[in-house]
């Protein structure tokens, strides 16, 4: 398995331009994904995930400059999320149930995705993507959380209505200390 944190090396230089149609297709896919998450249409969102999904959010630590490559935990270290399809399905069941105190009442979220850069891979129809995000979450009366960061995805073209599926997602948040009560939502 590719160390998804170190896939950043793919984006050390400006990617070669891709066809505008492909850029638009992928951006529209992300906008649709954000709408599904914001509208809490989790079953439809889950259908965008590949059966071999790896959903990973490493822990970020503050490091001095010479140790900056150790800023994020690796695949064999602790992580906020290190999920496959089965784990994702369990998380989905939990946050949509009436017994999950962390999402009952449900959070109100707004996902904003931007700065989408695309690199075609050696596999036909698969793409490495870097995008930036902001997730705004409001819950109950006064709980407010804002997360910003980068998502590194591998998308695979498929015949589904959305046109792609998410094979791999790595979420690199800008915060090293998470002040939110929980992480009971999806990025």
Swiss-Prot record:
Pathway: Aromatic compound metabolism; benzene degradation; catechol from benzene: step 1/2. This dioxygenase system consists of four proteins: the two subunits of the hydroxylase component (BedC1 and BedC2), a ferredoxin (BedB) and a ferredoxin reductase (BedA). GO terms for biological process: 3-phenylpropionate catabolic process. Gene3D superfamilies: 3.10.450.50. It catalyses: benzene + NADH + O2 + H(+) = cis-1,2-dihydrobenzene-1,2-diol + NAD(+). It comes from the Bacteria. PANTHER family: 3-PHENYLPROPIONATE_CINNAMIC ACID DIOXYGENASE SUBUNIT BETA, BLR3401 PROTEIN. It holds the Pfam family Ring_hydroxyl_B. It is an enzyme of class 1 (oxidoreductase). Keywords: Aromatic hydrocarbons catabolism, Dioxygenase, NAD, Oxidoreductase, Plasmid. Signal peptide: none annotated. Belongs to the bacterial ring-hydroxylating dioxygenase beta subunit family. This is Benzene 1,2-dioxygenase subunit beta. Its EC number is 1.14.12.3. The beta subunit may be responsible for the substrate specificity of the enzyme. The keyword Nucleotide-binding does not apply. GO terms for molecular function: benzene 1,2-dioxygenase activity.
């Amino acid at each position: 398995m590719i160390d998804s944190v170190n896939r950043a090396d793919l984006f050390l230089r400006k990617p070669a331009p891709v066809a505008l149609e492909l850029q638009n297709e992928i951006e529209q896919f992300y906008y649709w994904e954000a709408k599904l998450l914001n509208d809490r249409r989790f079953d439809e969102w889950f259908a965008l995930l590949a059966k071999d999904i790896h959903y990973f959010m490493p822990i970020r630590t503050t490091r001095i400059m010479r140790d900056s490559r150790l800023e994020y935990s690796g695949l064999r270290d602790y992580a906020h999320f290190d999920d496959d399809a089965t784990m994702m399905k369990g998380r989905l069941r939990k946050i949509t149930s009436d017994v999950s105190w962390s999402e009952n009442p449900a959070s109100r979220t707004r996902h904003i995705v931007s700065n989408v850069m695309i690199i075609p891979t050696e596999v036909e129809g698969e793409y490495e993507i870097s995008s930036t995000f902001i997730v705004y979450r409001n819950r109950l009366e006064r709980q407010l959380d804002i997360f910003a960061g980068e998502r590194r995805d591998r998308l695979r073209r498929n015949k589904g209505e959305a046109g792609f599926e998410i094979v791999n997602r790595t979420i690199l948040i800008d915060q090293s200390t998470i002040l939110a009560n929980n992480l009971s939502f999806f990025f």
